[in-house]
Amino acid sequence: NYYSKREKKLKPILYFAANEKTLIVADSISKYYAININDGKLNWIKNNIAPFNSQVKVFKDKFFVVDFENILRCFSIKDGKEIWNFKTEKSFIKSQQKLSLIINNDRVIFVNTLGDVSSIDIKTGNLIWQTPTQSSDIYENYFSLKNSDLILENNTIYFSNNQNQFFAIDKRNGVIKWIQNLNSNLRPTFADSLVFTITLEGYLVAIDSRNGNIVRMTNIINKIKNYKKENIKPIGFIISQDKIYLSLSNGRLIIIETLTGKPLEIKKIDNEKISRPYVLNNNMYIIKDNAILKLN
């Protein structure tokens, strides 16, 4: 165990990434460390000057993570030493949202708590381009801004937020291709030239990836009895060949027909919030409080 009693009381949030030999952990109390996957032994452990609040990404002999100061940091997997860092503008408050990173070829691309998307040279840490997505005049938006994960398809970055904005950004130069008015901080999914998302109001939306036009919008949450009264919110979704699996804040999982957007089944997983579904080796998993469930 790598935490003292005092640290355990802080209930740190852990962020993971791994390669074939090493598990990398960064947490919300500024610690980061590496564990040998084969024997579980600690390779090294270090402390950052600020807590971490992003995904961790591994690329060759390096890993990348963003801290609460909106600084992207590149570390060595071998010994944990910092190789370079890239600073972006700090926010007035420390957002609790987990920030998203993607790695593509020679670039690491991330969005900070202010909604600025930055593309960084993976070797040098130099800025390639930066695209702000929020007006600097509307400071109150920063306090409540929650972005979805970034996804990358066909040289285009897609993501959305809870400020009624869905973006398509050119990976090569940071130019915004289009913006659609959709309210969602759920990770979108790309399939057959369409981008799928589910809004916080419960609408399944299919978007033409080329121009941002909405192809279809279907209300799926209203199929649940008393969904408005109970303030049920979508948590996350995945798409299979013919079905969409959507987890909800009330512990339910909705199975939706992809072609029509029609809900097929509602499964009770728990009475509390559950995670977005995950797929590993053709099996689906959902995380709930203190447990990981494998679904048939």
Task: Specify the residue positions occupied by each region the protein language model found.
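C-terminal closing repeat unit and adjoining cap/tail of repeat-based domains
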Residues: 173, 243, 248-296
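Loop/turn-rich, solvent-exposed surfaces of beta-rich toroidal or solenoidal domains
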Residues: 190-207, 213, 217-256
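Extracytoplasmic beta-rich repeat domains
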Residues: 1-17, 41-60, 82-105, 127-154, ...
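Short loop/turn segments that connect beta-strands within beta-propeller blades
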Residues: 36-40, 76-80, 121-125, 170-173, ...
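Structural signature of WD-repeat beta-propellers
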Residues: 27-28, 67-68, 105, 112-113, ...
